[in-house]
Regions:
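Stable alpha-helical elements in mature extracytoplasmic
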Residues: 26, 63, 67, 93-97
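Sequence/structural segment immediately N-terminal to covalent heme-attachment motifs in c-type
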Residues: 24-41
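N-terminal export/targeting leaders of redox proteins
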Residues: 1-24, 105
Length: 105
């Protein structure tokens, strides 16, 4: 019985690791975290297009840290009346996403 439980736990751990590793690119990470349900790279959907976010924050030294907080905690009032909810991402994932967003042209 202990071997069955141990094997089940190992399988679960492997599945979790595989799903985390599945997002090999920032765009895949954005898709897996459902960012693309409200955002697109070039067109406004519910939220702003990522290229517009990059243009707005271009040259701002604190842009990455500011946007990481918005991604993690949510926010409102910057892009219109629809608030962005907080997102279930790690600090590292938020930084990866924001660096990718700020690189859009």
């Amino acid at each position: 019985m202990k071997q069955v439980v141990a094997a089940s736990l190992l399988s679960l751990a492997a599945a979790v690791a595989a799903s985390a590793a599945h997002a090999a690119t920032p765009e895949e990470l954005a898709k897996s975290k459902n960012c693309m349900a409200c955002h697109a790279t070039a067109t406004k959907l519910v939220g702003p297009a990522y290229k517009d976010v990059a243009a707005k924050y271009k040259g701002q030294k604190d842009a990455e840290d500011k946007l990481v907080q918005k991604v993690m905690k949510g926010g409102a009032g910057v892009w219109g009346p629809v608030p962005m909810p907080p997102n279930a991402v790690s600090d590292a994932e938020a930084h990866t996403l924001v660096k990718w967003i700020l690189a859009q042209k």
